[in-house]
């Protein structure tokens, strides 16, 4: 990837909340739909700010000055998305049936997640952001937009999705780097962490795993059952994660080995039905998404591609789903 070209694109495609015309009126909604839509956008604001915190950590760790500038634009993107989500919540809150607050599980997860960021290795932090962005871009945002079915949401989501596509391109690029011999060489040159740091890292990581499942269920899986009841887009997002997680070099790091092991256990013809629930709990997702979601042909094709090619194919899948 040409990082300077990507940075130029990031700067060129910036926009503001005021670029959207907020003077329109929303379409008529039932009470149930209005309450659901306002809550969805309220939670979306919290999710976007969580993504922004991850990009702040990635910017802090990045050594390449161009990459740091790219992450700076991503941080601005996520805050802008959060503000737009808040304004969309207000826009559709016509009847003010009740008071809306960010989902309790999202609120409780945030401080533990931010604390864990300080101890997560580079590849782990990147894998969390990549997974979250794939769910957002391929599944959640587009399904919310279809559910709302209103011009105001469509205009906002078009701009947000354009930003998220840039994010995913960089997420995959960084995943490729963390799967490379160059990253292993960089790790070997770093001084080993102290025993106290390793203990804190494991403690925060185990705490993150413990809280990830209820967070993911409340913020991603339950809303998707409402806005995408067939689960088609969610399966597509997790298929892209599985294809990426099976690429050469992913198992270079302990977290990559754990990911691959959980997938292999879940896909095993004998152990899978017995242990898939346990593997899903560790991964923080629903068991159905630990099943094998790709064909042999799709895996063979993916293994012939580099990570930038996988990103392009993941983004192209949005149009097909």
PLM regions with names:
Residues 1-321:
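Non-heme di-metal
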């Amino acid at each position: 990837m040409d990082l300077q070209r990507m940075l130029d694109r990031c700067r060129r495609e910036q926009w503001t909340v005021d670029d959207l015309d907020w003077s329109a009126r929303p379409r008529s909604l039932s009470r149930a739909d209005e309450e659901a839509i306002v809550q969805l956008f309220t939670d979306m604001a919290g999710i976007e700010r969580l993504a922004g915190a991850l990009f702040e950590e990635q910017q802090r760790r990045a050594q390449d000055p161009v990459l740091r500038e790219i992450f700076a634009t991503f941080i601005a993107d996520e805050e802008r998305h959060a503000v737009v989500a808040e304004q969309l919540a207000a826009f559709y809150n016509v009847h003010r049936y009740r008071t809306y607050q960010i989902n309790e599980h999202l609120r409780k997860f945030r401080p533990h997640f931010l604390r864990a960021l300080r101890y997560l290795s580079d590849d782990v932090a990147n894998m969390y952001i990549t997974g979250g962005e794939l769910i957002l871009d391929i599944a959640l945002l587009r399904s919310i937009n279809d559910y709302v079915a209103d011009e105001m949401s469509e205009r906002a989501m078009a701009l947000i999705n354009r930003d998220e596509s840039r994010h995913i391109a960089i997420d995959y690029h960084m995943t490729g780097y963390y799967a490379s011999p160059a990253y292993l060489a960089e790790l070997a040159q770093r001084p080993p962490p102290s025993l106290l740091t390793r203990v804190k890292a494991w403690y925060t990581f185990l705490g993150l795993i413990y809280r990830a499942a209820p967070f993911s269920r409340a913020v991603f899986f339950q809303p998707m059952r409402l806005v995408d009841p067939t689960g088609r887009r969610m399966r597509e997002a997790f298929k892209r994660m599985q294809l990426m997680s099976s690429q050469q070099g992913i198992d270079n790091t302990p977290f990559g080995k754990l990911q691959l092991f959980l997938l292999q256990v879940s896909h095993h013809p004998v152990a899978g039905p017995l242990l898939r629930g346990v593997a899903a709990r560790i991964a923080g997702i629903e068991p159905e998404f630990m099943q094998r979601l790709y064909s042999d042909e799709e895996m063979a094709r993916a293994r012939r591609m580099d990570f930038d090619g996988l990103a392009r194919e993941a983004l192209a899948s949005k149009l097909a789903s």
